[in-house]
Amino acid sequence: MITGKNFIGNVLSSIGDVTFKTFNPLANIENEIVYSEASEIEIQQAVELAANAFSVFKTVSGAKKSEFLNEIANEIEGLGDELIKVYCSETGLPEGRARGERGRTVFQLRSFANLVKEGSWVEATIDTADLDRKPIPKVDIRKMLVPIGPVVVFGASNFPLAYSTAGGDTAAAFAAGCPVIIKSHPMHAGTGELVASAIIKAALTTGMPNGVFSNLNSSGIEVGVSLVKHSQVKAVGFTGSIRGGRALYNLAAQRPEPIPVFAEMGSVNPVVILPSAIKNNENNWAKTYAGSITLGAGQFCTNPGLILGIKGGDLTNFIQILSDEIIKIEPTCMLHPAIIGAYENNKTKMQEQDGLKTTASLNKDVADNYGKQTITTVEGTTFLNNTALHQEVFGPFSMVVQCENMQQLSAIISKLEGQLTGTILADNNELENYPSLVSALQNRVGRIIFNGVPTGVEVCPAMVHGGPYPASTDSRFTAVGINSIKRWVRPFSFQSWPNDLLPNELKSENPLKISRLIDGKQTINKI
């Protein structure tokens, strides 16, 4: 049952005066439940509990953390149809999307459970002593990754499960040994509370310390600002807009003790069409990209918002077919009024730019909060000279840039900001002819795709979901996959430390039987 209260550790709390409701964009009405925004007192309590819990949780074994993560997954599944119903009522998204996202969420949790149970992720490294070394004896030094401390995670509006309360940021932080405080997204507070209750149940069942998790409601920016500025918070995870992510990044940098903010933000995900791709296949690629642009009402951070090709008859045909196909697709509901408002505003600003031509725009009346898909096109020279055209329009929108030649196309890629993805459509032989183009695109993105679409982010160890700024605040890390755990850890060394007092991961006898780097060689052997 949803209470509308905050979880301050294991305890429900609602002592603040500010309240709010979520919104059903499909019905265009407020939902009934009233939520209590976290007060400063509750924020302080949650952070202090997290700091106290960290002293215990950081020592919890990988096997026990695995049990905790698996139990969270079990409890989320145990929420059954209630979770699906609330999710849909707060997002306007269809039931199939809700069930798919729930599956992704529990898969992420179980992936991290397997990772920490096996244990080698800590990158244990041992350089043994050589007391006979001349002229200076060599001391014994042993290193491993350790948790960074309490983490604040901001729920994402476009993924109420997979990037929110028990999403990838939270799962990775728990796996690392970090307590988590969620700043719940106001548009899906009910979904967040249900998932929070599942986490609390799992924590109680598996004996995790009180404060390992808290869930704070908020309808504005104040709660998030207070959390990021709190001295006992040691890292932040965020998925959302460039404006929001950069504001948090700046706040964290201004603290007396700056902390990392791992923000996944804006991206137009450029798609490069080489001539061979559409010479005889423009129909198929146009249909494919019409579907990708409108998938989920265009509300994916990997939405293909920019398409680059060489001016000519084949590209003209592609633009025409893409425009025709996208208009055939039924529009869908966007997540909440603020998103549809921002989409319409940013789309209008883009369409007002000199030289931009709209080739497809849905003219028929649609229900409230439905996004009308739009295709635009512009000359390469105009695009190069106007950086306003480089900005993201979050929603079912894409721009096709008609470049004069490959040199101009490469110049455009070099001028782009950092992106999550870049895609090249071509045949193998043609791709080999443009190594500098491929290299330029690699410099701008975190993931490069050949003959596919960027929408869809597989949860797997090889995935990189990140990229140069402003796609993310730190291109060295991924927000998806087991390697995302590295955002919430730091390397730590023990020098000449008694073996019996070392963590099990670093003991000479290797009781956990994990893979370790010992004197430069990877092995599971004891010393």
Give names to the regions the model predicted.
Residues S120-A290, K311-T316, N525:
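Rossmann-like NAD(P) dinucleotide-binding subdomain of oxidoreductase/dehydrogenase enzymes
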Residues V366-N369, M406, A411-L502, I524:
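C-terminal core of ALDH-fold dehydrogenases
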Residues F68, A176-T191, V212, E257-L274, ...:
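Short loop-to-beta-strand entry elements in the cores of soluble alpha/beta enzymes
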